[in-house]
């Protein structure tokens, strides 16, 4: 059995007396739908120590922490796979949700003026991008929006472009909707940095007639924050061939210090005219379970086409608490998010330092997201193992539940993805397990080399 981490109380363990009093909704100072300037909460200074508090998420129906056995993993596995954080969300968000739950009515809701002002203010403030409120369509998530775009803009059998390795739902939403995937490989240079092969992309467009590209910006899992110059070069190719770009920018807020996300549609009005931008606070504020995403489409025809497809699903009003949380995050979450980005940068550096002790495993350079892409090819070679055996080592030897690189498509073999958005104690425990497992398996391989046996026990 592996050692369990000792949890501390999380900020969610609030007593009723800690809840903000429900505002008098008739009072002049109360937040109202017609008062976009009204804010839920004034954010205090952020204590970085909050990110190292160890929460206990077991027993909360957590996909990450409560589903190991159901999904065929060991019960005591340490989960660092799915992309949600082991950090409580921003206090501004918690405060707004507490206020909303004290109100006690959870009827149908729609984005109001305050929500729209928070959304447009966020993109103006954080990206210098002047988004118009009418561009936005709320959906229950970015992945559903990707699927909607595929269905709205292509016919069964037509080709959709993706760049692999990439977040695996990119391929899934194409294939489940009976379209054809054309995967253009990213190229890893001598420094381990992934680059786009524009010549290969253009050749694929010409060969397949594809008119839709799913872009991951920043890129999951390889950690690239595409530069403005790289995106401008991509824009030139896609515009020349009439390709609509569906930009998954869910990790945009998580560019690490020293890097900045450029929204693809912000390049120019011409770029925006053939772009569907998929955004959400779910990664940056840990709100995935509240199911709210904002899909920004400046072109009126594209927007109508997308909304028509959304209407066929029967979806109309968004999650009430999702709207509340998103508005609060975008109104008052800046300082907390900046502190989180610093914490993630430190976590990344800490993991990279610890990997120096582990022969045969190294992290690809990471510019954004809280996901590290680990190259385990050296370890596999030393241990005499095949890429398909890597996940078995992680689960049964290290007691770690990571994401096997093969699920991200071509180029993922021999890699694994680890989520570093967790307390330092969790990272230390994970790297200790990894170091011990690599040492054990490698030593076993050396011992058995003369016997013609494989390193993993039968």
Predicted regions and their residues:
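N-terminal small-domain helix-loop-helix segment of the aminotransferase-like
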Residues: 46-141, 148, 332, 441
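Conserved small-domain helix->loop->beta segment predominantly found in fold-type I
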Residues: 338-341, 349-383, 404-411, 445-457
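PLP-dependent aminotransferase class I/II
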Residues: 111, 274-368
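Helix C-cap/helix->beta junction micro-motif
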Residues: 177, 208, 240-241, 271, ...
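PLP-dependent enzyme catalytic core of the Aspartate aminotransferase-like
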Residues: 2, 383-385, 389, 393-402, ...
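Conserved core of the PLP fold type I
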Residues: 106-236, 253-270, 276, 445-457
């Amino acid at each position: 059995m592996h050692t369990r981490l000792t949890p501390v109380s999380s900020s969610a363990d609030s007593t009723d007396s800690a809840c903000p009093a429900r505002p008098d909704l008739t009072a002049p100072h109360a937040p109202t739908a017609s008062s976009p300037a009204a804010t839920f909460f004034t954010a205090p200074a952020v204590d970085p120590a909050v990110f190292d508090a160890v929460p206990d998420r077991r027993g909360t129906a957590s996909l990450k922490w409560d589903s190991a056995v159901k999904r065929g993993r060991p019960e005591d596995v340490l989960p660092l796979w799915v992309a949600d954080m082991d950090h409580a969300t921003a206090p501004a968000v918690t405060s707004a949700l507490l206020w909303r739950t004290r109100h006690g009515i959870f009827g149908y809701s729609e984005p109001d003026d305050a929500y729209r002002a928070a959304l447009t203010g966020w993109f103006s403030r954080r990206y210098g991008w002047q988004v118009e409120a009418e561009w936005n369509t709320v959906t229950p998530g970015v992945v559903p929006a990707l699927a909607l775009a595929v269905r709205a803009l292509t016919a069964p059998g037509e080709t959709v472009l993706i760049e692999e390795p990439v977040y695996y739902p990119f391929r899934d939403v194409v294939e489940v909707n009976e379209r054809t995937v054309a995967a253009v490989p990213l190229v890893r240079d001598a420094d381990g940095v992934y680059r786009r092969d524009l010549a290969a992309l253009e050749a694929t467009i010409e060969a397949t007639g594809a008119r839709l590209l799913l872009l991951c910006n920043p890129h999951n899992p390889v950690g690239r924050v595409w530069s403005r110059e790289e995106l401008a070069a991509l824009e030139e190719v896609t515009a020349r061939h009439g390709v609509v770009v569906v930009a998954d920018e869910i990790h945009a807020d998580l560019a690490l210090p020293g890097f900045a996300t450029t929204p693809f549609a912000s390049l120019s009005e011409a770029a925006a005219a053939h772009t569907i931008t998929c955004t959400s606070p779910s990664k940056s504020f840990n709100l995935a379970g509240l199911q709210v995403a904002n899909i920004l489409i400046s072109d009126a025809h594209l927007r109508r086409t997308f909304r028509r497809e959304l209407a066929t699903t029967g979806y109309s009003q968004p999650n009430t608490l999702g709207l509340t949380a998103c508005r609060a995050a975008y109104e008052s979450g800046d300082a907390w998010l900046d502190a989180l980005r610093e914490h993630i940068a430190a976590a990344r550096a800490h993991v990279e330092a610890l990997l120096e002790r582990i022969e045969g495993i190294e992290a690809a350079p990471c510019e954004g997201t809280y996901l590290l892409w680990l190259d385990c090819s050296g370890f596999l070679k030393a241990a005499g193992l095949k890429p398909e055996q890597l996940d078995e080592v992680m689960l049964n030897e290290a007691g770690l539940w990571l994401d096997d690189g093969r699920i991200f498509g071509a180029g993922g073999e021999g890699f694994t993805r680890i989520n570093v958005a967790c307390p330092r104690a969790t990272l230390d425990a994970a790297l200790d397990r990894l170091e011990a497992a690599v040492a054990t398996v490698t030593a076993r391989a050396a011992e058995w080399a003369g016997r013609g046996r494989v390193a993993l026990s039968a």
